[in-house]
């Protein structure tokens, strides 16, 4: 599975923990607010907002909270104006890292991001230093044991770019971002609702991480992901099974 990283699986577990302490809601509200501000409050004409709202509802956010966030973004209610900033850099072992943030204070945010990189042996780079390594994709994930033939049939007919099967039997449907909503709707309508789905940035080529670099790299990714202003962390790091086993030993 090209570009598949165990960091993605780690993030999914972290998201569950974040949800328990309310941090996930904060991220989702920011995304809804900014999406509504940039593209308007109509879900039918604003795919970014529709995706953000779907994610919020999937996380059991109340419709009232969602509606207030949309109104704040559309200027119908007072609220904080967030600015989107992407930071790029290199982590231990030379792996590429992109950090998407939403902030009301860019000086605070860049200081916190730079501190995390420096503390963990990485380097904050310039705009464009690693972005070329990543591609925006829609991803729908299914657990091992799912009906591979049926998923492949429906996905490709709906316009998916690829269907990839992992070594563990898990399945990923890859789409162009513009086709993501249509593919997801077709899969759900066919009774094939994904276990996890998102529009994300995927590296074209993975960078294997050795056992020496792995602890400090994971610490850096965790530090970045835990920052209040950080929405998403992307990396081309690939943690081989033997490295993860060594870390868990």
Curated annotation (Swiss-Prot):
Cellular component terms per the entry's GO annotation: cytosol
Organism: Thioalkalivibrio sulfidiphilus (strain HL-EbGR7)
Sequence similarity: Belongs to the TACO1 family.
Molecular function terms from GO: DNA binding
Principal place of residence: cytoplasm
Family matches, as NCBIfam families: PRK00110.1, PRK12378.1, YebC/PmpR family DNA-binding transcriptional regulator
Keyword Acyltransferase attributed: no
Record protein name field: Probable transcriptional regulatory protein Tgr7_2237
Subcellular location: Cytoplasm
Origin superkingdom: Bacteria
InterPro entries in the cross-refs: Integrase-like_N, TACO1_YebC-like_2nd/3rd_dom, TACO1_YebC_N, Transcrip_reg_TACO1-like, Transcrip_reg_TACO1-like_dom3, YebC-like
GO biological process, one term: regulation of DNA-templated transcription
């Amino acid at each position: 599975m090209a570009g598949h990283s165990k960091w993605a699986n780690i993030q999914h577990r972290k998201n569950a923990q974040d949800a328990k302490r309310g941090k996930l809601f904060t991220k989702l509200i920011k995304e809804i607010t900014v999406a509504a501000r940039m593209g308007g409050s109509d879900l039918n004409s604003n795919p970014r907002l529709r995706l953000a709202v779907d994610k919020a509802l999937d996380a059991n956010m109340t419709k009232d909270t969602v509606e207030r966030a949309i109104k704040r973004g559309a200027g119908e209610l007072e609220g904080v104006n967030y600015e989107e900033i992407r930071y790029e850099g290199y982590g231990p072992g030379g792996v590429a890292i992109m950090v998407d943030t939403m902030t009301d204070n860019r000086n605070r945010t860049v200081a916190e991001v730079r501190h995390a990189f420096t503390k963990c042996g990485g380097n904050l780079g310039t705009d464009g230093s690693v972005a070329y390594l990543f591609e925006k994709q829609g991803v729908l994930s299914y657990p091992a044991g799912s009906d591979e033939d049926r998923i492949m049939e429906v996905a490709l007919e709906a316009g998916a770019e690829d269907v990839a099967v992992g070594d563990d039997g898990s399945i990923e449907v890859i789409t162009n971002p513009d086709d993501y909503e249509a593919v997801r709707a077709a899969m759900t309508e066919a009774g094939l609702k994904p276990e996890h789905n998102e529009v994300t940035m995927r590296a074209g080529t993975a960078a294997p991480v050795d056992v020496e670099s792995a602890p400090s790299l994971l610490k850096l990714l965790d530090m970045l992901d835990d920052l209040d202003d950080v929405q998403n962390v992307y990396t081309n790091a690939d943690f081989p099974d033997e490295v993860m086993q060594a870390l868990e030993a």
